[in-house]
A protein has these predicted regions:
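A gly/proline- and charged-residue-enriched helix-loop-helix capping module
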Residues: 120-169
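Active-site/acyl-donor-binding loops of N-acyltransferases
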Residues: 2-38, 45-46, 99-100, 171-196, ...
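A conserved beta-strand-loop-helix scaffold within acyl/acetyltransferase catalytic domains
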Residues: 33, 38-89, 93-107, 156-161, ...
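Conserved acetyl-CoA binding element of GNAT-fold acetyltransferases
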Residues: 110-127, 294-304
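Aromatic (often tryptophan-rich) hydrophobic motifs at membrane interfaces
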Residues: 135-142, 260-380
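Residues at the N-termini of beta-strands
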Residues: 116, 149-151, 294, 332
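Short, flexible active-site-proximal loops enriched in glycine and acidic residues
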Residues: 108, 112-114, 145-151, 176-182
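Short catalytic-loop micro-motif centered on adjacent basic/acidic residues
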Residues: 151-154, 222, 334
Length: 394
């Protein structure tokens, strides 16, 4: 079994519990939804946030989007968070945070009891043995059926070709009508134990740019997200950078209150870091998420792009993040995607719209990892088909 060990010490809660201790400590809150055929669904919706996050966000394959904070954040947008531990033979094999909403809102009628389910970047596997994965997927099927879900959509971020998508097909899941995530191809840097070993992974010009930024006097800063006063001012400044960058480069930026609330929630949970770099000030910044053994690039912003090209501040920022992540105990740094729905796959020449972004990430030692599509499961085939058709023509 691949147990749910804490991925790294610095971000973990002060009191770390084993799986058995966690389940025992919260026995009074547990509701057994199904115990047939050796499978048990433990309702963990009311668990305290640190206990849930130790499994869902900080275990080896954990993900920040499966955290307690992320589920509660979506409550304000009309979703109801549901959290479950799936056990097989009294052994936890997976956890999942599901966002649920009514199919028809407040309207009644024959379809009034039906719901829509989405598990962002879930489920989180605690055991990757084939029989454990099958049990985890069966648990998801039963949750969807019992909660009258028309469809359950999952996008767990499993690597394409890993064999896990075969288990999905065998469990009655099918490729979703549309992907949830903008990009399926990420660039991941394998973190090394020493600076010398990490530098060997850099492209020649990248090492030069890092040295140039250092010589010019560019400085980097990591914000203490536990310090409320410093955090709020820094997040507000970062939002201004992020919004300005969105206008320059043409990507969508959510409204200030929503973005600040999601960043704040993840920061308070110890699942996000905010960094800045600049020459005589804060010129560029990056927000990063703690997802199991990976540090994940989530959002970025900068002031004048031309000045950044001159100072190479972003090169030094990425390098300092990489070194900090390696020293903290992360196994890899996910630098983010390099493809889109309209231009899928690893860029192979300059005709790809994200070719330059791909080169930038590759020069830090990033290697492409293609993740599977989103998958759907419909307990009722007829309703599921109707839902797919309705979404296709929306």
């Amino acid at each position: 079994m691949r147990d749910a060990t804490i991925a790294r010490g610095a971000a973990a809660s002060p009191r770390r519990l084993s799986l058995e201790e966690l389940l025992s400590a919260h026995a009074g809150l547990r509701t057994v939804a199904d115990r047939s055929a050796g499978l048990r669904l433990v309702d963990a919706t009311d668990w305290l946030p640190p206990a849930w996050d130790d499994l869902a966000a900080r275990s080896t394959l954990g993900d920040a989007f499966q955290s307690h904070a992320w589920g509660e954040l979506k409550r304000g947008l009309g979703w109801r968070p549901l959290r479950y531990v799936v056990e097989a033979g009294d052994t936890p094999v997976a956890v999942v945070s599901i966002q649920e909403r009514s199919l028809l809102g407040r309207r009644g009628g024959p379809l009034g009891r039906y719901t829509i389910h989405y598990a962002p970047h879930g489920p989180v596997l605690l055991d990757t043995a084939p029989e454990a994965v099958s049990a985890a997927l069966e648990g998801l099927r039963r949750i969807a059926a019992q909660r009258c879900a028309v469809t359950l959509t999952i996008d767990p971020g499993w690597e394409e070709g890993s064999g896990l998508h075969t288990a999905l097909s065998g469990a009655g899941f099918r490729v979703a009508a549309r992907d949830v995530q903008v990009s399926r191809t990420a660039m991941i840097v394998a973190l090394q134990p020493s600076e010398a070993a990490q530098r060997e992974m850099l492209g020649h010009t990248t090492g030069y740019d890092i040295n140039r930024a250092t010589a010019l006097g560019v400085t980097t800063e990591r914000i203490d997200m536990a310090d409320a006063a410093g955090r709020e001012a820094a997040l507000a400044e970062f939002y201004d950078m992020h919004s300005a960058t969105g206008k320059r480069e043409g990507f969508i930026v959510r409204d200030r209150d929503y973005e600040l609330e999601q960043w704040r929630s993840l920061g308070e949970a110890g699942l996000a870091d905010l960094w800045f770099a600049g020459l005589g000030g804060r010129d560029t910044g990056a927000l990063l998420l703690h997802s199991g053994s990976l540090l994940v690039y989530f959002a970025a912003g900068s002031r004048d792009g031309a000045d950044l090209r001159r100072t190479r501040a972003n090169h030094l920022l990425q390098w300092r993040i990489i070194r900090w992540a390696g020293e903290t105990g992360f196994a890899g740094y996910d630098m983010g995607g390099v493809d889109t729905h309209s231009a899928p796959g690893v860029p192979d020449d300059e005709s790809h719209p994200l070719w330059n972004l791909y080169l930038f990430k590759r020069r830090f030692g990033g290697a492409p990892v293609v993740r599977i599509h989103a998958y759907e499961f419909a307990p009722n085939a007829a309703l599921g088909l109707a839902w797919r058709m309705a979404r296709r023509f929306r």
